[in-house]
């Protein structure tokens, strides 16, 4: 900075010359007007108002003037800097508003465009029903048990009182694993899970065992070589056929609502006495029986639909698991999950549930039960 100059001549300090100051202001205003972005305007601010700008240097030269001249020079420089700062502020607001509008325009969503959504997934109807069945029985205090799908001959047949001459052991009914002589097969029911449980757990036992089972069946509208079952087992003191009937009735109501059931005498090697469980036809409600004018394809005009099997556990099964039959008794039941889903949704063909046709799955998604 220059020292005080008592013989001050304004011409000698060019930075303080009025024309020079006006020229610097004009340059700054022109640069401000040319700035098209806030980033460019920031650079203009540094160039024309920063510490090394012409106006800043002129402001520092005021100290070199005699006291009498400092007031006019300070006023002139202050007014010049004020004009530049005011122009910077106005231009900053203009550019900021313009940039905001541009960003909003770029980010605007056209609400008239169709919504692009991802395909909605949902549990398979069979999986959903298995979960539903498990919820029903766990709410009653039962447990869910699982076991291997490939079983030994003893677990799948012998322990369940199916003798060596039972037709279920034949190649045309059971899927035996190579080598056949090893006595390994794909389980034909989930009953082996009950044997595994009884060998590991002493009564009282209350379990259900849902899962896949395998049969050498034809693949048609009512049969599948791989399908799903849920079996239940209750072993405790004083268990009777009455307990079985009450449990199966409660299960039927949970699945189908206020439906009538019928217990029809039958034979199963692992239960004695045994029964088939029938449900009153959901379509004709028995009105087609003996009425040729109103035939029902669902129940074949019989008024009832077969649902599953049940019975009091054969003492031989309990003895094979080391359970004292003088103290304990039990009941068992088994129903097809696939058939239950079929009944609940009035589906005519079991194959629709396993062929992976998305159109069929979507048709059930809204009203599948």
Curated annotation (Swiss-Prot):
An example molecular function term from Gene Ontology annotations: tRNA binding
The protein's Enzyme Commission number: 6.1.1.20
Keyword Heme in record: no
Primary localization: cytoplasm
Location in or out of the cell: Cytoplasm
Record keywords, A-Z: Aminoacyl-tRNA synthetase, ATP-binding, Cytoplasm, Ligase, Magnesium, Metal-binding, Nucleotide-binding, Protein biosynthesis
Name the UniProt record assigns to this protein: Phenylalanine--tRNA ligase alpha subunit
Species whose genome carries this gene: Cutibacterium acnes (strain DSM 16379 / KPA171202) (Propionibacterium acnes)
């Amino acid at each position: 900075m220059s020292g005080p100059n008592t013989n001050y001549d304004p011409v000698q300090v060019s930075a303080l010359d009025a024309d020079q100051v006006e020229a610097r202001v004009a340059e700054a205003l022109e640069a401000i007007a040319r700035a098209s972005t806030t980033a460019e305007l920031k650079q203009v601010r540094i160039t024309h108002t920063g510490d090394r700008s012409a106006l800043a240097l002129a402001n520092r030269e005021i100290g070199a003037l005699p006291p009498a001249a400092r007031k006019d020079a300070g006023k002139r420089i202050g007014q010049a800097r004020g004009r530049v700062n005011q122009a910077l502020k106005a231009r900053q607001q203009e550019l900021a508003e313009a940039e905001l509008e541009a960003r909003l325009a770029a980010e605007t969503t056209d609400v008239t465009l169709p919504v692009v959504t991802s395909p909605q997934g949902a549990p398979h109807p069979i999986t959903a029903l298995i979960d539903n069945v498990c919820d029903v029985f766990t709410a009653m205090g039962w447990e869910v048990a699982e076991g291997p799908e490939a079983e030994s001959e003893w677990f799948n047949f012998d322990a369940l009182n199916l003798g060596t001459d039972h037709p279920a052991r034949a190649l045309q009914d059971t899927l035996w694993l190579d080598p056949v002589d090893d006595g390994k097969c794909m389980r034909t029911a989930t009953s082996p899970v009950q044997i595994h449980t009884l060998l590991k757990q002493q009564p009282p036992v209350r379990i259900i065992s849902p899962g896949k089972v395998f049969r050498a069946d034809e693949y048609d509208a009512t049969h599948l070589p791989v399908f799903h079952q849920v079996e239940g087992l209750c072993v405790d003191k004083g268990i009777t056929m009455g307990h079985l009937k009450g449990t199966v009735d409660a299960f039927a109501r949970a699945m189908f609502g206020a439906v009538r059931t019928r217990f029809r005498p039958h034979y199963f090697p692992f239960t004695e006495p045994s029964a088939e469980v029938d449900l009153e036809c959901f379509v004709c409600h028995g009105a087609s029986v003996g009425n040729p004018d109103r035939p029902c394809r669902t129940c074949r005009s019989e008024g009832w639909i077969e649902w599953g099997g049940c019975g009091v556990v054969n003492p031989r099964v309990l003895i094979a698991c080391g359970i004292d039959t003088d103290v304990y008794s039990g009941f068992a039941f088994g129903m097809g999950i696939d058939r239950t889903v079929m009944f609940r949704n009035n589906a005519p063909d079991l194959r629709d549930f396993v062929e992976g046709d998305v159109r069929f799955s979507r048709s059930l998604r809204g009203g599948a039960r």
